[in-house]
Amino acid sequence: VTDNHAAFHRSADDLAIGLDHVRDAPADDGVVELLVVRPRLGERRELATAEVDLVLGLVGDTWIERGSRRTPDGGPNPDAQVTVMSSRAVELVAGDRARWALAGDQVYVDLDLSLDNLPTGTVLALGEVELEVTAAPHTGCAKFAERFGTEALRLTATPDGRALRLRGINTRVLRAGTVRVGDRIAVRRPAS
């Protein structure tokens, strides 16, 4: 989607009004809403079905080719193998579903991604795949601000935005397999 991004930016008031809908996401029985691979820089391809690999992450995505400032050797960060964003949060900032993939995440879910609901170590089972929520922070960037507005980026960085994980979560692959749009998501939290 290439467009005049500024035409779609929402005001701080409009964003604040939508937070209750994000908070109302299911805690335990979610659903996969969208799967996206990034085959090349700036490209997005939506999938109905995706393969997830223990090493590659989402097959066809360039995650494995991207370096990270968070790894000693500058290689890909294994704790950010697959990124997951709330479909309610992306709908809040992006509006039209055709713009969701611009957020740059790979899996969009209708599930409460908040820190209280999904502490580090929580396992998400979707389709045949298991993803573990990692402590690696998932934060907004200049591209996010350009596409969705500075107010959207600011909201993700507020205490509420961070607690709700509006920008999403990072995960690593525990079990490879197939995932499909429409798959249910089961949540297994770590033992206390």
Question: What is the predicted role of each segment?
Answer:
Residues 1-192:
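Metal-cofactor-dependent catalytic cores
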